[in-house]
């Protein structure tokens, strides 16, 4: 491992999910397939939303943004991992590692904010259906997404800046398939108090704040559904939330799993394996969760395919 001025490291080693050479071809093709499915699945959601004017509503606008962010999230980590596995090369440059941290933190934060915004959208749709169009105006929708971007950029910029202040004095091997913020901070040989404090405080404020907002929205939604007299009305109201609730549960449960796993051990492949759920699996499943349970998305896709076949 090369060093510069004995303090600034030039590169890190990403140990990946397994050091077993026999498993590398399987890992490569598995993740290559998952990457393609994720990108194409989310692109189809975006395409269906853009081409069908009936989907030009607040809910699908947020879903379109979520699909775009999921493509960016998985593209931040998986292409580099695939390149390393293919070339049998574990190194990532210092600059590349910082860039991964910045963009990964940015897009995970955006996922977090967008899920909260979508919960608010469902709250307005079910609790205030007659005022939905007057509340969820295009201006408000754009503002909510813009605020989400600004908050995420500020968060990732601060986290990356604090990492830049750290020194790495020895060979740094990261037991992960990408540069994960908390792992990198704990591998530093300089004082990590500010970085640790920023990670914990911002996770509590941003992540916890969004989760509280989601839980509050759904508490109101449940109360409103219970007030509906007919069973059919209750089912119809609840069915509009099932897809979003499934994605929220998957996202936050896997994040909790990563937190609990890292609390037990820092330098372990188990944490990397657990983080696969929200870094790869969740973005891959989101399009299927929304499209399989959403008649509007399925209709838009059928119409798109039909038009293509008729040409």
Swiss-Prot record:
It is found in: Cell membrane. Residues 47-57, 119-133, 218-244, 293-311 are cytoplasmic. Keywords: Cell membrane, Disulfide bond, G-protein coupled receptor, Glycoprotein, Membrane, Olfaction, Receptor, Sensory transduction, Transducer, Transmembrane, Transmembrane helix. Disulfide bonds join 97-179. Tongue specific. It is a multi-pass membrane protein. One of its GO terms (cellular component) is plasma membrane. This is Olfactory receptor 1073. Belongs to the G-protein coupled receptor 1 family. GO terms for biological process: signal transduction. InterPro entries: GPCR_Rhodpsn, GPCR_Rhodpsn_7TM, Olfact_rcpt. Residues 1-25, 79-97, 155-196, 266-271 are extracellular. The keyword Cell membrane applies. Possible taste receptor. GO terms for molecular function: G protein-coupled receptor activity; olfactory receptor activity. Glycans are attached at residues 5, 155.
């Amino acid at each position: 491992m090369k060093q510069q001025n004995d303090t600034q490291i030039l590169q890190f080693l990403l140990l990946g999910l397994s050091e077993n050479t026999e498993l590398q071809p399987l890992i490569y093709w598995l993740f290559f397939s998952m990457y393609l499915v994720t990108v194409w699945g989310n692109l189809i959601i975006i395409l269906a939303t853009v081409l069908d004017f009936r989907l030009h509503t607040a809910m699908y606008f947020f879903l379109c943004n979520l699909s775009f962010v999921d493509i960016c999230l998985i593209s931040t980590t998986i292409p580099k991992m695939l390149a390393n596995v293919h070339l049998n090369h574990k190194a990532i440059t210092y600059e590349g590692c910082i860039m991964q941290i910045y963009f990964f933190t940015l897009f995970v934060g955006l996922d977090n904010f967008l899920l909260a915004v979508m919960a608010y959208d469902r709250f307005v749709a079910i609790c205030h259906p007659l005022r939905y169009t007057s509340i969820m105006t295009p201006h408000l929708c754009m503002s909510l997404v813009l605020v989400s971007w600004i908050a995420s950029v500020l968060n990732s910029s601060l986290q990356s800046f604090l990492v830049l202040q750290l020194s790495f004095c020895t060979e740094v091997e990261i037991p992960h398939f990408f540069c994960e913020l908390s792992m990198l901070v704990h591998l530093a040989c300089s004082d990590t108090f500010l970085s640790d404090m920023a990670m914990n405080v911002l996770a509590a404020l941003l992540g916890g704040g969004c989760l509280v907002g989601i839980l509050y929205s759904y508490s109101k939604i449940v109360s409103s559904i219970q007030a509906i007299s007919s069973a059919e009305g209750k089912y119809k109201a609840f069915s509009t939330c099932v897809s979003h609730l499934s994605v929220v549960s998957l996202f936050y449960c896997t994040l909790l799993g990563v937190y609990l796993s890292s609390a037990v051990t820092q330098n372990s492949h188990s944490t990397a394996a657990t983080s696969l759920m929200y870094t790869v699996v969740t973005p891959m499943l989101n399009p299927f969760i929304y499209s399989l349970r959403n008649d509007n998305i399925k209709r838009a896709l059928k119409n798109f395919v039909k038009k293509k076949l008729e040409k």
